[in-house]
Amino acid sequence: MAKKIKTARAIEANAGIQQKFKKKLLTFSRAFSTEIVKAILLDLADNGLLAQDRSLTNPKNPQDKRTLQEISKMVLAKWSRNPEFFKDHVEQFIAQHLGSWIAKATPQARKIAEWVARSTAADVTASQRQAYVAAGLPLDFMAEKWTVPVVRQRISQKAADELPSIIEWSTNLITKMAVNDVQRLQDVIVSTLADGKNITSMRKLLGVTSGFDADRARRVAIDQTNKIANGILRANDFSLGITEGIWVHVPGRFSSRETHKAMNGKRFDLAKGMFDPAVNRFVSCAELPFCRCVYRPALNFSQLLKTK
């Protein structure tokens, strides 16, 4: 009879961090979109009627509302004279300024990425430590290996070394998601003018057709935190000498990968991952898009404590 493998419990990303991350993503995306729409509309009006500190996207006082009506008439008049030229002008304006918009947005995206990476690293490490103590590993065993301070916790040097690349990866994804919404903004502006509607209608349509909606932000938040969590957990495990795990399939919200269902309960090399025939390569937990799978670390006490 095969000897039963001793394991610690699997660790999942923190739902509270995922929720906060979702809100940060929505706030960032909406602010980015608002700035771009304002810049486009100001350009369409030749900056002649609106001061830079007034809001075209959300006018509050009577003066701004009157100015908006005047600009609406001006923009529609220009559009009616030469729609194709006007459309090309919008496209060229976006192409010319997209780089500067990205440069302006990137520091805020990086700030969010740093927060989610460090918060997730600290949270999963705390849970990981508790799981190992409950499984019977001495607390000082982790204390000797996890020495780098991160948000009131200490993680392994290997995990700390991976944080910069995690932050860079997350920053790029956050920025890219906002940039991908620029095409939607352009399409709404052009189609609204083509239909002869005013800027007030345009603002309403932009709000209704929000590209980065709450559900998409939730999916992105879950996916990114799962990937970050599993990366940190593996790095911490490697520092302890833990090299194998038991795959735990976590069902998706609407569906599950059949190959990952088949992986459930199987032992695998943490460094190598497990072979997934659906993609014809080895994968780690949470590596594929929207995969929520985790693992239970396999514990060989005699081997681990021998290297202590």
What are the residue ranges of the model-derived segments?
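Acidic, glycine-rich two-metal-ion catalytic cores of nucleic acid-processing enzymes
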Residues: 211-308
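N-terminal leader/targeting and assembly helices and adjacent pre-domain segments
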Residues: 1-212, 299-308
